[in-house]
Structure formats: structure tokens, C-alpha cells
Amino acid sequence: MPLGEQEKGFIAQLEAAGGGGFNEMSVEDARLAILQLFKVENPEQVASVEDRKIPTVNGDLPIRIYTPTGDGPHPILMFFHGGGWVVGNLESHDAMCRVLTNAAQCMTISVDYRLAPEHKFPAAPDDCYEATKWAVLNAAALGGDPQRVAVGGDSAGGNLAAAVALMAGDRGAPSLAYQLLLYPVTNHAFDTESCKQNGEGYLLTKKDMVWFWDHYLENDEAGNAPYASPLLAKYINSPAPGLVMTAEFDPLRDEGEAYGKKLQDAGADITISRYAGTIHGFFGLFQLDAQKKALAEAAEGLKAAFAK
């Protein structure tokens, strides 16, 4: 189907505001830009929100814990924000974590992992894996259920969720109930049909992705590592079930769907859901109808996995 009218209007607004893509900005300006992009007035209320720092082998790691209403122990969603491993933080994805907490009736733990270029790969997946281990070990004290832990994220956060799921399989722990991969980055390559078709004009561009990867990796060879490019993993051990969500007008569409098929081939119960007429980032764009449908699908998948 053609690009949706709401999406056209959103892109026109961005173009009218000027500023160019992330690839034309300094890292500092790009970090400010994502806060504006996903800014939500009056985000949903949850039962409680707590910021804390947790000890890891690489130092203290900031996290934010969102607790839903109702009696625990609550299932846990470990959430890793998008932003090309370079931008984004607890604030940029605060509204997204709130709606997921309420819709899926789960405790959401958002991880403020170390960003590139100050901290290159594998700092981000290492932090996300350490945070997930910590959450499982400390779930009872938090009011969470260590037997019902999922990972999820959008874009580069979806990449990190996929990486943590791979790490958990490779290392034998923790056991994960679900992986929620929202238009994930899965391969350090720019050769898919969707990258050619949607490489410019739809919010995220091919040039942006090159810029993000260049900041994230020490060198191109590092992009062949499966925890950087999950699509290149030779073996997938005990893959968790999950949902891979993609957008029709997204350069990352095909690599996300290819990874979903790879997980299916490895025996995982994976739903691949392409949203027609919409663009990269739509899960955080609350003005789009696609966001509401996607939130409902994500929540349904999480709740079903947590009920098993």
C-alpha cells in the first residue's frame, strides 16, 4: 500500500522544520534531536517509576523500573532503547516504556547502556546482558518473577534484544520467555531491497545507518560478530519465542524479516508482522494509528508468553 496519510504529514512536518538527518549532525545535536522526536506530552501513568544504578563488571549501570498496577510478582520486560547505539536514553523512550508496562501488565526495566562512539561494540550488548542477569537474580526483591523475563527494544534496541537472546542461548542463562524485536537492526550490510527502496525520504535513511554503524564499530570486521549482526549468527541455541515487527517504508524492513525467518528456521515460535504504509520509528510515534495497533499486538504477544 502507499505511504499512509499520517506518515506523509509527519514527514512533511519534519522537512518543514529542517535540520537534516542524524548523519548531518554532531553526536551532541543528534542526542538532543531524538529527545524531541519522541517527546510525548502527558505520558501515561504507571503504579511506580524508580531510577537506580546497578553494579556490573563495567561499573554502575543506570536503569529505570516501571511497575504496573496490581499484585505481583510481575513478569519482566527488559527494554533496550533505540537510537543507533549512539543516541537515546531513559528519557527518550520513557513514554514507550510506560505504555508497554500498562498494556502488557508487566514490570519494564529500561537500561541506560553505554553509548558509542565513547563506548564502542560490544559495550552496549554487554551492558544489556549484565542488566538482564541482574534482573533475574533480583526479581523477587523487585516484585518481579524471574521465571517470566522477556527482552525487547526498537531499532538498535531490537538489535540489542536479539543479541542478549543469542548470548543467553550461548551461555545457557538466563532463560527468556519472549523477544520483542521492533524493526531491529540485524546486519552490518546495506544490500537489501528495502534499503535500496527506502534509503531516503522515510525518516531513517541509509546514510543515517552508515553513520550509526561507523560510530558503533571499531572497524568493519567487528560488524561480522553475531552480537553486532545477529543475522550472521551461525548457531542459535534454544531461541526464545517472539515477535519481529517491521515497517513497509523502512530501510531495515528486509533484514528484520530475514532475522525473523532465521529464528523460525532455528525452531523458535516467531511471528513476523509487517506494518503496511508506515515508517521506521512508528512504535514511538504516538500520533500514528499504526502505533496503537502495534502496541496492542506487542502487548498481546507478551501477555501470551507470560501466561505460559
Segments the model singles out, each with a brief description of its role:
Residues 2-25, 32-308:
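Alpha/beta-hydrolase superfamily serine-hydrolase fold, recognizing
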